[in-house]
Amino acid sequence: MWIDMTLTERRAEFVYEGARIAAKAANAPIVPDPWSEREQPFREQFLKVIERQCGDQRSKSPEELHGSWMQAYFEMGWFYGEKYDRENKIHPDLVPYADLGQLERDKDAVFVALCEIARQWIIE
C-alpha cells in the first residue's frame, strides 16, 4: 500500500494505473499489465520518467513526452515492429509522433494530464 512508498512511487503507480485503465477503456490494442506485475527494469525506468514529469524539466506536450518515451524504450533495448511483443521487446509505437494514430496521440495526452494531476495533488 502507499504507506511505505516514496512520493515518486505513489505518483508512478497513480499515473501508470490511470493510463492503463484509460487504454483499456479506449479498447487500445496494447493494454499494459498491472503495475504490480511489471518487471523491475521497467518500473525503475518509469520511476525516472515520473520523477522528471513531476519536476521542472517535465515534458509539457504529448509530442515531447512521446520523444522521451521512445528514447527510454530504445535505451531498454526495445525495437520497432508492427506487432507488440513484450518478450522480444518489439513495439509498434516506436515511431515519430507525427506517424502515430489518433488513439496513441490521445494516450500520450492522457499521460501528460495524469502526470500533471500527480504533480499537483499527490504530495508528501
Regions found by a protein language model. Give the residues of each.
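Alpha-helical propensity feature that highlights long, continuous alpha-helices across diverse contexts
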Residues: 1-124
